[in-house]
Amino acid sequence: MIEIQFYNSLSGKKEKFSPANPHRVTVYSCGPTVYNFAHIGNLRAFLFVDVLRRSLKLLGYGVDMTMNITDIDDKIIRDSIASQKSIQEFTTPWTEAFFEDLKTVSAEFLEHYPKATESIPEMIQIIQRLQNQGLVYEKDENLYFSIQKFEGYGKLSKIDTSGMKTGTRYDTDEYDKEDVRDFVLWKSPKRKGEASWKTSVGTGRPGWHLECSAMIRKIYGSGVDIHTGGVDLLFPHHENEIAQSEGAFPEESFVRTWLHSEHLLVEGQKMSKSKGNFYTLRDLVGQGLDPKAIRFLLISAHYRSKLNFSTDRIAEASANIRKIQNCLDRLLDIAQNVKIDPSYSFNDELTLRWKKEFEESLADDLNVSKALAVVFESLKTINAFLDSKKNRVAEISANEFIQILAYYDRIFGVLNFESQKDPLIDSEIDSLIQERQTARKNKDFARSDAIRDQLLAQGILIEDTKDGIRWRRK
């Protein structure tokens, strides 16, 4: 088990990660609001959770992770009423689409995906405890949290509530940091067809912020080691979660470490439908983009840095995957019967150093970009070694290199470890290359170019090197 340093949004600095139980690190992540397809900004946040999960496991920790499904909020109620469907009928297809998107980008599935509507009793329990603490008041049949009565309000977002006018409040779920007001815990129905529950605190439905506090309590009993989400959720959502949970259960620790992933830009601009740069994963796949390249790009930058999504960056991601895969394919041609072993013990001094540097990069606040530098340094060395030996290396050496690439891919999840070698196809390619060489000797450049184009159309690239002609698959 390797010591990890995380940047904790609560303290504003890197800290040694000290989970209550390293063999069961508890993690809660804010998931999708299922009223439409997730956009690629959402996807970056979801893939950050995937990198966190994979990194914790690779560094020796056990995990118990949750991502919620928000299946009741203002937007869902608005759109379900417009479509004349029940909440469940409306949200089920969007929930299924979310899981399909996760599969498309090879995200590992978590232990829990609770729906907000499944935790109404836990929400009522929190409200009742807050009422007992004197932190709740009623107005127009809605229940509100009085933030001025909670001493610790603002400790995550570092806002100052001293200038807030007493009794000002918000009924909507989302609002700006510059306009702090009391937030709603429980809303009475205002429109015909609006979903509601009959409870001991009144007929209504939960405010968005209450939902996550309740789901954490239902699954974990108290608090969690790590809570993640996009930086846009830091205020008001996560600040309000703290207020509710610590207000209701002041004797308990709610969250030890807060991790927030930064915004995604598209072609250097904030994503917006009005700008025409708003994309879902399905939009991009429909345009012919490789899901592996999308995944690789979205996880390649440090999670606390803004990431620019562009056609050039996607092309770069595709090229980088090809570089790694081409090196792997060369090795698989040598050691065709290799089995990937997650518990493999590296023997070579070089691979041991790469493994250590890769782990240290991830343990440094999930520094994936630094880890990638280790990957490409090792690729350069492996390819140079294979070139110097003209691919005539022992299977044991090839296997060592294959295992280190597999180790890297436990984070990136983009490689194919099935051998691409097919003797029949290879012999045909070799025959065509020999024919091309003959054509070039005879100065039949038209025939030479035609063979090159024929091979290229089949995904075969020819490289003229000082050691002779080498070919590889794209």
UniProtKB/Swiss-Prot annotation:
Binds 1 zinc ion per subunit. InterPro entries: Cys-tRNA-ligase, Cys-tRNA-synt_Ia_DALR, Cys-tRNA/MSH_ligase, CysS_C, Rossmann-like_a/b/a_fold, tRNA-synt_1_cat_dom, tRNAsynth_Ia_anticodon-bd. A motif ('HIGH' region) lies at residues 32-42. The keyword Nucleotide-binding applies. One of its GO terms (cellular component) is cytosol. Its cofactor is Zn(2+). Its main location: cytoplasm. Zn(2+) binds at C30, C212, H237, E241. GO terms for molecular function: ATP binding; cysteine-tRNA ligase activity; zinc ion binding. One of its GO terms (biological process) is cysteinyl-tRNA aminoacylation. Keywords: Aminoacyl-tRNA synthetase, ATP-binding, Cytoplasm, Ligase, Metal-binding, Nucleotide-binding, Protein biosynthesis, Zinc. It is found in: Cytoplasm. SUPFAM superfamilies: Anticodon-binding domain of a subclass of class I aminoacyl-tRNA synthetases, Nucleotidylyl transferase. Its EC number is 6.1.1.16. HAMAP family: Cys_tRNA_synth. Monomer. Belongs to the class-I aminoacyl-tRNA synthetase family. This is Cysteine--tRNA ligase. The lineage of its organism: Bacteria, Pseudomonadati, Spirochaetota, Spirochaetia, Leptospirales.
